[in-house]
């Protein structure tokens, strides 16, 4: 026989060209055997940081998953497909909205996550789906398809940083002449929040609780969106340069909303100002460091409590990545309407992977299936199999 040494980071190349493989790290043999098996284990474990305990947890989970039947695992999850982030968002929404009518739709511009974050509570109060615009100058094909299928009487457009007036003209040209109402044109995320809140107050849309999040805490705010949808809760997104919240406090007081959740460290620093105004504040994920998992667990518990008894949720899972938010614009309505939550996993961090695995294993009875979101930025085949195995 011939032994060939291949130094490569391409797992596919190793699996395709070799019969056997050895994974050597820091001068020690970590694993050896069938090349395809070794490549898949390395693909789910190599190059990541984390504690020794987390590494062992992920290593064991990968081996367990790869020992299971592929068809059995694939029956426990699905992957959102599409040509781009807009089409994946809208396909996910249409799938989750199947069998429902929609007299109103919220169309969100995809230049900033703030549009979707503010729209989630608003859409929940209307019982409306969220459609991702897919472009600033015109609607994407997937957005047009979704709107034509839903055929709403009213379209609410959330357009901080876009879309442009051309899109409004396009909406108003539809044959059934929907009413088009827009928020946020040419203004900041906080002004967008204020405009949507004022409309909701005037039409008695809101519940008895509001949420305040900082613009920079985009992961926390997207994780929160299924719950704000389900609670019909207004969301105020603070500008990064925000110095006070007096205008927000005045608006909340005018609507007799006195329960305020301050989410993330960026919003929590204003607690004294809200408390001084006589509002009851609740701090969520206010500590330093990664607070995303804390937000996820809170939302998961809430959505489980309002879900159908004896029926586990289809849990949405995405990678924790700064560039991931365009893939997650419709998770608010998808999760809120179907009593589901969004989990984010940092695929470069073993501690994050181990925490997700442990949580799924301990809550397997509450999760029927997994729905992976994210396209090329999402989780790979090894991570998908590993997570699905934990509920199988």
What are these regions (language model features)?
Residues 25:
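A cytosolic small-molecule/anion-sensing beta-strand core signal
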Residues 56-392:
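Extracellular glycan-binding segments that recognize GlcNAc-based cell-wall polysaccharides
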Residues 14-16:
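A short, surface-exposed alpha-helical micro-motif characterized by mixed small hydrophobic
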Residues 28-51:
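Conserved beta-strand-loop-alpha-helix hinge in the C-terminal portion
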Residues 8-9:
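H-loop/switch region of ABC-family ATPase nucleotide-binding domains
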Residues 22:
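Conserved catalytic/dimer-interface elements of ABC ATPase nucleotide-binding domains
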């Amino acid at each position: 026989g011939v032994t060939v040494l291949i130094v490569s980071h391409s797992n596919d190349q190793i699996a395709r060209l070799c019969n056997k493989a050895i994974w050597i790290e820091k001068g020690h043999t970590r694993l050896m055997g069938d090349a395809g098996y070794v490549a898949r284990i390395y693909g789910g474990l190599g190059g990541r940081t984390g504690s020794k305990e987390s590494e062992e947890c992920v290593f064991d989970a990968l081996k367990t998953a790869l020992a299971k039947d592929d068809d059995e695992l694939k029956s426990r999850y699905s992957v959102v497909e599409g040509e781009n982030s807009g089409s994946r968002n809208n396909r996910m929404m249409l799938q989750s909205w199947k069998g429902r009518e929609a007299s109103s739709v919220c169309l969100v511009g995809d230049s900033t996550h703030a549009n979707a974050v503010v729209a989630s509570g608003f859409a929940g109060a209307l019982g409306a789906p969220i459609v991702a615009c897919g472009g600033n100058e015109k609607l994407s094909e997937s957005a047009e398809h979704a709107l034509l299928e839903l055929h709403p009487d009213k379209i609410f457009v959330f357009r901080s940083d876009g879309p442009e007036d051309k899109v409004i003209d396009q909406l108003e040209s539809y044959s059934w002449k929907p009413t088009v109402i827009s928020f946020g044109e040419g203004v900041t995320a906080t002004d967008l929040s204020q405009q949507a809140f004022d409309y909701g107050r005037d039409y008695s849309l809101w519940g008895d609780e509001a949420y305040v999040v900082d613009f920079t805490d985009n992961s926390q705010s997207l994780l929160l969106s299924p719950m704000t949808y389900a609670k019909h809760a207004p969301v105020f997104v603070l500008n990064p340069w925000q110095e006070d919240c007096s205008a927000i406090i005045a608006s909340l007081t005018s609507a007799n909303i006195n329960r305020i959740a301050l989410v993330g460290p960026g919003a929590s620093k204003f607690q004294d100002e809200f408390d001084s105004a006589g509002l009851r504040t609740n701090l969520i994920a206010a500590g330093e460091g990664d607070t995303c998992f804390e937000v996820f667990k809170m939302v998961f518990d809430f959505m489980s409590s309002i879900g159908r008894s004896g029926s586990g949720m289809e849990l949405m899972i995405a990678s924790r990545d700064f560039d991931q938010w365009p893939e997650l614009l419709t998770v608010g309505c998808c999760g809120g309407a179907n009593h589901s939550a969004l989990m984010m996993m940092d695929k470069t961090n073993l501690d994050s992977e181990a925490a997700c695995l442990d949580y799924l294993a301990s809550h397997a009875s509450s999760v029927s299936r997994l729905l992976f979101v994210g396209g090329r930025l999402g989780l790979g085949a090894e991570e998908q199999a590993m997570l699905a195995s934990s509920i199988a």
